[in-house]
Amino acid sequence: MSEQRLKNFKVLTRCLHRFELFKKKDGSRVFSLTLANLSPELLRQIEDFLTDEKAIFLRYPEIYEQFPYSAKIAVKTPKRKRPPILDDEGNEVPKGMPKPRGQNTVADLLTRLRAFILWAIDNGYTTNNPFKHFSIGEIVYGTPIYISNEERNKLLETDLSDDKEVETQRDIFVFQCLVGCRVSDLYKMTYRSIINGAVEYIPRKTKEDRPITVRVPLNDTALKLIAKYQDYSRDMLFPFNTEQNYNRKIKIAFQRAGLDRIVTVLDQQTRQEVQRPLYEVASSHMARRTFIGNIYKKVKDPNLVGALSGHKEGSKAFARYRDIDEEMKKELIGFLD
């Protein structure tokens, strides 16, 4: 089992432990979640539990002390006291409080549980399959939101010298836009990853299932960003921060660069389309989408783009990038004149 799959199953295991403790505290003191008693009704309860763990946390915070919502290992950075995280109303968010899960995330967790149940049946641990009479919600994605090369350059050229931390995370984001890797692979890059003018890495997500080396040539901008932060005593390619802080600083950098065009995104909790300014939806994964989207617009060859992004041949991910962009739409309408 790959490292990423193992991590995902550990997340599921903690969720099920918390659900079991919740049931015990909510009136069923002798409740025990087993392969034998798992039923469609229990699956519906688990689905509801996964959808809104925040409410459970506020009622029974002790459950989350025993089985934390998150067990992330942060990138090592100098210790300093961080300001508390505030919600939209300015109230301090209790440490360890779960974030609302989207329907895709809940469906993904239930799909992993179903895979485990089917494995248990195949290996003789149970004959009970509650998923025969339980339907997992469909995983739905919206159109990928990414920035144009012009917007990326505007972001890079924005003067952020008054806030070095935002400037640094902005520069890392732009570098990620130029190499297209996932943030987990970015954080593992060192100076040894640079070979003959290109960055080489084995995507962590597919390392054990399909260990291929991805090689992405570095353009002048990428090489200048590496040189700007060159520090061989650090070993890591850039002064990385936690992914949470990285995403927070990216949003600030976008806003300061005036990247505020309105985009339509899919609210994963309600599955409704909502309009939001670009800087609000900016995140580390937008860098990967930017790399893929801008190249795919030019070549329209998923296998060629996949050789640079690490996607396997025939990946369904590229189907989401096939929407005709605005410039092409205008050109097509021009044919009617």
For every predicted segment, state its role.
Residues 1-4, 13-143, 158-161:
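N-terminal core-binding DNA-recognition domain of tyrosine recombinases/integrases
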Residues 154-155, 214-224, 228, 319-337:
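DNA/chromatin major-groove-contacting recognition/catalytic segments
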